[in-house]
């Protein structure tokens, strides 16, 4: 049955089935090791290596060590030659388990974070999407930005950091992932040697319990008539990463697509909303997005437009949502499925994104979902499924809206809410 389902794209299926296998091993303390062998955040110092010595050790290997934080995950990653794997694992273990957290290092990173906060304020897209999370998930952890307020960065102490690490850096919550010329058995042996000391127990009743992140239909406006363009995002509550509705919503987002004023094509663009944007000069750019978290998500459209086109663009954006719920066609879905498959494959171009993908999959699903399985799930989506799932998440739902800039023309929230359904018989 599965073979029959994938028969129309048999050449693609053959290439996906031939993709490298991701192997997974769990240590006795709960730490998971995942690797995929192929043929081709800021870190402070550790107790063994001060920050300057750590940087020198990484540079002497010709490697790259960094870190990043998202709303649900923190990652430390290193890119290095295969022959330096033992040293790389040792350094990562030191960073995770033995950070020195000296006052000098903390003060240095404090200034780095404050500078990053200033840079984020200069990215109006980041500001708009942070405001969207703040209003959509108000009063919950997802409502906070990744960097947090500047007051926190200025007042954070060493004791705060130590308490956080002791509460959250536990083996069952960690994944050691690799991609490239790495033998899985060798990696497991190195992990046992370097990470076996990671605790899997919590002190007393200190087990962190995830907070329920409820969605609230609401709006937040930051009007500034001196700005040249308006930045606006509208979203409804989406599906969590493990929801069976995630793939139909990805297809739906692919139907809406994205647009930039620099695109060629004009009225010949594949996305209906993109064609309207080009023909009617509705906006400078827009993109459909779906931010998925463990138990919820945001399904939305972000656009940048002239202050005189806000009402028109908002109308057609919501109209595109209503079309997904009522009149999406076979050709729309077929085009979107092809675009989505190409996007998923293109995102794994290199060992760094592959490694990141492995780590997130193990944390979210407990396994790495192969591309062949994604392909099968996407191919199983039909127009009826898209209409049903979009009706479940979009139709007659309260949206969350964030807007920054010259937004006098942005409709009243009640008008935007009333455009989330059609009075048709």
Set out the residue ranges of the language-model regions:
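Active-site SXXK
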Residues: 42-47
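Aromatic (phenylalanine/tyrosine) cluster motif
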Residues: 3-4, 10
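Charge-rich, well-structured scaffold segments of protease-associated domains
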Residues: 1, 21-22, 26, 37, ...
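N- or domain-start disorder-to-order transition segments that initiate the globular core
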Residues: 9-40
């Amino acid at each position: 049955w599965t073979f029959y389902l994938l028969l129309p794209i048999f050449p693609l299926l053959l290439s996906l089935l031939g993709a490298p296998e991701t192997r997974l091993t769990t240590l006795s303390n709960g730490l998971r090791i995942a690797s995929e062998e192929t043929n081709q955040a800021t870190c402070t110092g550790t107790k063994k290596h001060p920050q300057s010595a750590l940087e020198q050790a990484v540079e002497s290997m010709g490697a790259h060590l960094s870190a990043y934080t998202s709303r649900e995950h923190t990652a430390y990653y290193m890119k290095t030659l295969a022959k330096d794997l033992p040293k790389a694992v040792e350094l990562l273990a030191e960073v995770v388990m033995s950070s020195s957290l000296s006052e000098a290092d903390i003060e240095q990173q404090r200034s780095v974070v404050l500078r990053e906060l200033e840079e984020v304020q200069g990215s109006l897209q980041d500001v708009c999407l942070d405001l969207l999370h703040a209003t959509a998930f108000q009063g919950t952890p997802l409502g906070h930005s990744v960097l947090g307020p500047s007051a926190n960065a200025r007042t954070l102490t060493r004791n705060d950091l130590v308490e956080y690490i002791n509460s959250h850096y536990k083996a069952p919550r960690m994944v050691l992932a690799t991609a490239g010329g790495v033998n899985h058995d060798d990696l497991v042996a190195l992990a046992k040697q370097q990470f076996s000391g990671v605790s899997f127990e919590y002190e007393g009743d200190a087990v962190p319990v995830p907070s329920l992140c409820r969605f609230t239909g609401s709006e937040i406006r930051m009007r500034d008539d001196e700005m040249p363009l308006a930045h606006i995002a509208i979203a409804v509550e989406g599906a969590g990463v493990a929801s069976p509705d995630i793939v139909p919503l990805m297809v739906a987002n692919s139907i809406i697509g994205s647009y930039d004023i620099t695109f060629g094509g004009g009225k010949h663009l594949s996305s209906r909303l993109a064609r309207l944007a080009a023909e009617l000069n509705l906006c400078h750019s827009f993109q459909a997005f779906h931010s998925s978290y463990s138990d919820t998500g945001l399904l939305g459209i972000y656009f940048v437009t002239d202050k005189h086109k806000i009402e028109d663009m908002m109308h057609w954006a919501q109209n595109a949502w209503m079309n997904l719920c009522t009149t999406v066609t076979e050709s729309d879905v077929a085009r979107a499925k092809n675009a989505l498959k190409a996007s998923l494959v293109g995102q794994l171009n290199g060992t760094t994104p592959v490694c990141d993908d492995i780590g997130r999959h193990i944390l979210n699903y407990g396994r790495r979902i192969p591309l062949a399985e994604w392909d099968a799930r996407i191919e199983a989506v039909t127009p009826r499924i898209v209409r049903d799932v979009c009706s479940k998440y979009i139709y007659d739902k309260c949206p969350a809206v964030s807007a920054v800039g010259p937004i006098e023309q942005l409709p009243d929230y009640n008008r935007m809410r009333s455009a989330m359904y059609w009075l048709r018989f």
